[in-house]
């Protein structure tokens, strides 16, 4: 075991040589430098993993679980995650086998080895009264808000995943971008990491602010490459306002990324009915947009 620091980010591991509880082994791993309450919080946050010989590491949370000789314990420790409180998502509909959520900006779609307490699926598992498992079937960037589906069983998860993979879903995005975008609907086919990528971009409105010109786009994608919309907007010379990775200009500094997955339509895997969700019909979402941009930006429902 390397020296543990309660103030620094680090990854640590411990070879289990004798049976004892997970909490006791975690105490050894952290060299008694964290309280029992903090250790339990790390378990709850999903920062602790256990590897059994000839198997992949798995996330473990139960403090009283007995570990066996030969197993290996891993801790992925980021002290700042202990202090973070995730934003609150909104349930748009619950069909029992799956539910529909509005994921806010700043909430991850999925966890990482460092933890999953701030991911949408884990928030739902720990806050929803039904205590059902929540499985992700598609993703949104952490800094993009929008509509997400969560499955509550493996069968429905596979069915919903197939809908996205076979492009039986319709997704539409809204993005405020820098500059004056041309009025004609535009197709961007700039390859991403050597793979084909297609995005349609349509100007809805544009305004002149103190910081400069900005345009509201509606975007639909035919492929799902990583950061596709953000990369294509930047490739066209109109980076998304607030995008710190692909071309944030100084005049728009301090703003959240102005990208929302506002529309989702898909065939229900249970009833076969077409389910359609549109955030522009949600008062809470409209209030957030009006707070950021004023009341004149809202588009017509389609």
Describe the residue ranges of each PLM region.
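Short beta-strand or tight-loop elements
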Residues: 87, 133, 173, 188, ...
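Short histidine-centered loop motifs in beta-beta connectors
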Residues: 60, 202-204, 212, 217-220
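RNA pseudouridine synthases
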Residues: 1-193, 286-293, 300
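Pseudouridine synthases involved in rRNA/tRNA modification
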Residues: 1-43, 203, 209-214, 232-302
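Short beta-strand segments enriched for Tyr within beta-sheet-rich domains
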Residues: 160, 225-233
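A generic structural motif
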Residues: 51, 178, 220, 267-269
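Conserved hydrophobic positions within beta-strands
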Residues: 91, 177, 200-203, 240
């Amino acid at each position: 075991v390397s020296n543990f620091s309660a103030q620094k980010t680090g990854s640590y591991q411990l070879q289990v040589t004798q049976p004892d509880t997970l909490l006791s082994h975690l105490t050894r791993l952290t060299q008694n430098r964290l309280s029992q309450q903090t250790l339990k919080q790390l378990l709850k946050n999903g920062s602790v993993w256990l590897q059994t010989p000839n198997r992949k590491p798995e996330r473990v949370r139960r403090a009283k679980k007995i570990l066996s000789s030969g197993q290996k314990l891993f801790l992925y420790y980021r002290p700042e995650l202990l202090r973070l409180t995730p934003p609150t998502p909104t349930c748009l509909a619950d069909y029992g086998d799956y539910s529909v959520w509005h994921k806010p900006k700043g909430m991850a779609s999925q966890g990482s080895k460092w933890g999953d307490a701030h991911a949408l699926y884990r928030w739902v598992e720990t806050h929803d009264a039904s205590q059902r498992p929540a499985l992700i079937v598609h993703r949104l960037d952490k800094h993009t808000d929008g509509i997400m589906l969560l499955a509550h069983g493996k069968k429905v998860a596979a069915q919903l995943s197939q809908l996205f993979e076979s492009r039986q879903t319709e997704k539409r995005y809204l993005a405020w971008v820098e500059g004056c975008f041309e009025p004609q609907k535009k197709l961007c086919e700039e390859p991403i990491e050597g793979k084909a990528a297609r995005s349609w971009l349509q100007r809805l409105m544009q305004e002149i602010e103190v910081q400069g010109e900005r345009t509201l786009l509606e975007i639909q994608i035919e492929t799902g490459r990583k950061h596709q919309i953000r990369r294509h907007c930047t490739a066209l010379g109109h980076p998304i306002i607030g995008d710190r990775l692909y071309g944030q200009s100084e005049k728009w500094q301090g703003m959240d990324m102005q990208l929302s997955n506002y529309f989702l339509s898909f065939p229900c895997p249970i009833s076969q009915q077409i389910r359609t969700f549109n955030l522009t019909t949600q008062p809470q979402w409209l209030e957030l947009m009006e707070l950021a941009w004023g009341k004149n930006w809202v588009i017509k429902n389609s």
